[in-house]
Amino acid sequence: DCCGVKLEMCHPCLCDNSCKNYGK
């Protein structure tokens, strides 16, 4: 996975503090 979400949902900001809730 990517930052706890499926690879299909992986996005550059997923690991960024400003977008840490993206895809949660």
Swiss-Prot record:
Organism per entry? Conus purpurascens
A cellular component term from Gene Ontology for this protein is: extracellular region
What does the UniProt entry say about where the protein is found?
Answer: Secreted
- Keyword Disulfide bond (UniProt): yes
User: Which Cys pairs does UniProt list as disulfide-bonded?
Assistant: 2-10, 3-15, 13-19
> Lysine amide (modified residue): where?
24
Protein name per UniProt: Conotoxin PIVE
Question: Anything further noted?
Answer: Negatives results: does not have any direct effects on neuromuscular nAChRs (human adult alpha-1/beta-1/epsilon/delta or fetal alpha-1/beta-1/gamma/delta receptors). Does not have any effects on human Kv1 (KCNA1, KCNA2, KCNA3, KCNA4, KCNA5, and KCNA), Kv2.1/KCNB1, Kv3.4 (KCNC4), Kv4.2 (KCND2), KCNQ2/3, and on the Drosophilia Shaker potassium channels. Does not have effects on the fish potassium channels, TSha1, TSha2 (Kv1 homologs), and Traw (Kv3 homolog).
